[in-house]
């Protein structure tokens, strides 16, 4: 079975065929770095980290670009509020972004361009659009894109221009021919810091949000990409405008496959800073380990909404413990490579090849864990660990993972286990039960077997 991807553009599952055999060019819209990242950002990063990992596991070479928006109205406002420079704020937030992403086990993209490093490319594309009659200079000094002059506008959202309305991220400014016309170049305002003003043939100013991605994607990956991704909230207007700009400038499709991840929701509302219902990645990491957060995300299909709550994260942690308990039974055999003809591996691959269906892939892991429990086969345990590696889970030491979270040190716990063994040998079963219950009250579960007693943190 070949890989199939749900293409937002066609609204169908399509067989994936890269432009260049064996190579994939993927661009994903990254963060606007005016504040710390929340779990909604984590979901997008994990989703496309998973995509690029599976593409690599499938034998493809991946060039993955995830941009950084480091010039934006929100960034300017926050820097002014803080009394710091734009560069100081964005450098600090980019460092924090990397700390959060690294903590979650997210691989760095091949390229992570900052918008401010690509101003010449943006100006060049704006100039091309103006020459083609797709951009116009407004009375207020801005340069706007004329959406009604691009025949395909609305094809990603599936609506005509007359059906579309100015969305929450479309600023309706003076001088626009149509409220939907995105700003390509924002003229400098006297009140704005000098560091956000670039010289250009259009006058001093800065780029609009949408043109940033169009120019960076073209510069780093070429005029047509294999995959363009981002959160579902970016379909309109951001990605719709990217298509209009890029295809208007080049005359070629911007991307052959469009992928969009679903929201993390709280109380059925999208998690966002504007709603104030967000949870910072680093705050959640104080309560839950990174692998639990990652597993919480990959248990759901990337296109579906994901409900955040402590209950769901607790359940994710308990489920991970079940898998690690199987790996703790027998030392996994190191595999040189996954045998995809193995029945479990074949099922896992079939799930991932069907639009990265991680819920079905995770179900295979639990079935395989049951097999490991029955057979205690090092080879099967090795396969479980290797398949988990495709999702970047199950790579920790099982004992370390199972024992994490307890406040007791190992020596104290072992002393209690030894005391319980002595009580049982003396047929003082009441004392043995007291020790077991005392440990349980402190979050320690004992497991007796013919070879001795082991322990783990309670689920």
UniProtKB/Swiss-Prot annotation:
Stored SUPFAM superfamilies: Anticodon-binding domain of a subclass of class I aminoacyl-tRNA synthetases, Nucleotidylyl transferase
Residues engaged in binding Zn(2+): 29, 213, 238, 242
Disulfide bonds: none
Reaction(s) the record says it catalyses: tRNA(Cys) + L-cysteine + ATP = L-cysteinyl-tRNA(Cys) + AMP + diphosphate
GO terms (BP aspect): cysteinyl-tRNA aminoacylation
Keywords: Aminoacyl-tRNA synthetase, ATP-binding, Cytoplasm, Ligase, Metal-binding, Nucleotide-binding, Protein biosynthesis, Zinc
The protein, known as: Cysteine--tRNA ligase
Needed cofactors: Zn(2+)
Molecular function (Gene Ontology), one example: ATP binding
The protein's Enzyme Commission number: 6.1.1.16
NCBIfam families per the UniProt record, alphabetical: cysS
Cofactor remark from the record: Binds 1 zinc ion per subunit.
Domain of life: Bacteria
Cited CDD domains: Anticodon_Ia_Cys, CysRS_core
Organism, scientific name: Variovorax paradoxus (strain S110)
């Amino acid at each position: 079975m070949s890989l199939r991807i749900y293409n937002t553009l066609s609204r169908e599952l399509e067989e994936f065929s890269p432009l260049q055999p064996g190579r994939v060019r993927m661009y994903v819209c990254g963060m606007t770095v005016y504040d710390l990242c929340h779990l909604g950002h984590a979901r997008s990063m994990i989703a496309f980290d998973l995509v690029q990992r599976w593409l690599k596991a499938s034998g493809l070479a991946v060039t993955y670009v995830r941009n950084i928006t480091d010039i934006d109205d929100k960034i300017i406002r926050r820097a002014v509020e803080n009394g710091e420079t734009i560069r100081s704020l964005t450098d600090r937030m980019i460092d924090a972004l990397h700390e959060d992403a690294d903590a979650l086990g997210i691989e760095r993209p091949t390229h992570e361009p900052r918008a401010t490093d690509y101003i010449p490319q943006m100006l060049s594309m704006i100039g091309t659009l103006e020459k083609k009659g797709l951009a116009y200079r407004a009375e207020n000094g801005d340069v706007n894109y004329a959406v009604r002059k691009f025949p395909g506008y609305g094809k990603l959202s599936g609506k005509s221009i007359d059906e579309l309305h100015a969305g929450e991220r479309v600023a309706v400014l003076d001088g626009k021919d149509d409220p939907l016309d995105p700003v390509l170049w924002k003229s400098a305002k006297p009140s704005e810091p000098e560091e956000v003003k670039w010289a250009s043939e259009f006058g001093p100013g800065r780029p609009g949000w949408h043109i940033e991605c169009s120019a960076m994607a073209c510069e780093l990956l070429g005029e047509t990409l294999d995959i363009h991704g981002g959160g579902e909230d970016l379909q309109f207007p951001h990605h719709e405008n990217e298509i209009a700009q890029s295809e208007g400038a080049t005359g070629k499709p911007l991307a052959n496959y469009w992928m969009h991840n679903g929201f993390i929701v709280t109380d059925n509302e999208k998690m966002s800073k504007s709603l104030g219902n967000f949870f910072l990645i680093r705050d959640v990491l104080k309560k839950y380990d990174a692998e639990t957060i990652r597993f919480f995300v990959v248990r759901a299909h990337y296109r579906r909404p994901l409900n955040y709550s402590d209950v769901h994260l607790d359940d994710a942690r308990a489920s991970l413990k079940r898998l690690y308990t199987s790996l703790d039974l027998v030392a996994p055999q190191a595999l040189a490579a996954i045998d995809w003809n193995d029945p479990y591996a074949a099922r896992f691959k079939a799930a991932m090849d069907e639009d990265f269906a991680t819920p079905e892939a995770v179900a295979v892991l639990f079935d395989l864990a049951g097999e490991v429990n029955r057979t205690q086969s090092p080879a099967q345990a090795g396969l479980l660990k290797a398949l988990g590696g495709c999702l970047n889970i199950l790579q920790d030491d099982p004992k370390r993972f199972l024992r994490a979270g307890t406040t007791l040190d190992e020596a104290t716990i072992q002393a209690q286990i030894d005391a319980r063994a002595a009580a049982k040998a003396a047929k003082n079963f009441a004392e043995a039960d007291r020790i077991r219950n005392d440990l349980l009250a402190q979050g320690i579960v004992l497991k007796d077997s013919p070879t001795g007693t082991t322990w783990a943190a309670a689920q």
